[in-house]
Amino acid sequence: MKRELEETRRQGTAMRPLQVYHMRCDPGAIDVPFHWHENAEILLMQTGTLALQVEAVPFTGRPGDVFFINPRELHGMQSASADCAYLAIVFPLSWLQFALADEAEENCLRPLADRRARVTTRLDPA
C-alpha cells in the first residue's frame, strides 16, 4: 500500500468519527483523487453518473447504486455527467462491531476488520 496515497484528513470528531460528504461535481473533474484510509466508506448515488475505481477495478455508478469501500482499499472517483451527485459516508469499521463475542462478530465482522474478508464493492438490490 502506498503510504503517500493515504488520506490523512480527520473524519468527524473524536467522539463521533463519522463524516458524510454531499458530493456535486463538474463532469470530467477528478472529484476525489486516488487514496486509501483506515475507515470503511459507503457511496450512495443520487443523480447522474460517476466513474469510480476500487483496487484497479472500474465501476459506473448510477442513481440508486450503493458501493462499499473496504478499509485500506485504494479508490478514486470522477464525475461522468453534469448532474452527478452522491453521498460519501466514511466511518470506522469498528462501529459495526459489538463488544459481544457472538457468531456475527466472530464469523463476519472480525474477518472484515482483520482484512481476511471483504464486502463486495457494488451492492446490487436484486
State where each predicted segment sits.
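A hydrophobic/aromatic-rich effector-binding and dimerization subdomain
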Residues: 1-19, 74-126
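A generic fold-level signal
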Residues: 13-15, 37, 53, 61, ...
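Conserved short histidine dyad/triad with adjacent acidic residue
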Residues: 20-37
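Tight coil/turn sites that cap or link beta-strands
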Residues: 28-29, 64, 72, 92-94
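Short, conserved beta-strand element in jelly-roll/cupin
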Residues: 35-53, 68
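Structural motif
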Residues: 49-51, 58, 74, 95
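Short acidic-glycine-tyrosine-enriched beta hairpin
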Residues: 56-71
